[in-house]
Amino acid sequence: MKIILLGYGKMGHEVEQIALQRGHEIIARIDKDKDIETQRLRDSETHEIVAIEFSTPATALENINLCFDMNIPVVCGTTGWYEHLDEVKARCEKENQALFYAPNFSIGMNITFMLNQQLAKLSEKYGYRLSLTETHHIHKLDKPSGTAVKLAEDIIESNENYNSWKL
């Protein structure tokens, strides 16, 4: 598979390392400080290409649209851009584009999401009060994280005692 890395920070480097170990080809690395490879990307054939997007909340939407302009499917792990999600979904439907996105791709965290939903249901039945606390490194770009937002939204969806969350 040919891969475009959109965002070449910590996650971009990790994705690259694993992709190369598995025999995939990195055809472009696009980062906020280095947009040099964009023209090469536009000139390449786009079949058998997927873009893996781990950039920033400020650039994710632009990156997704750039890929859609070239009919390149996107896997997006960036959060903090979801206020534009409805328009991206509409574009996917209208133009038959492909987007797979999640606030966290970790298997362990996705198990935690499921357990959180069950806990929210049980706590409603027995009257327990739920709260979330999140701690991150100082370089975290989206605060609260998409993971924390997903946990909070799942509690609201699973427990009628909650209808919103706040910082």
Predicted feature locations:
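Rossmann-fold NAD(P) dinucleotide-binding segment
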Residues: 41-78, 86-91
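Hydrophobic beta-strand scaffold residues
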Residues: 26, 74-75, 98-99
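Short, ordered loop/turn segments at secondary-structure junctions
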Residues: 32, 79-81, 104-105, 135-137
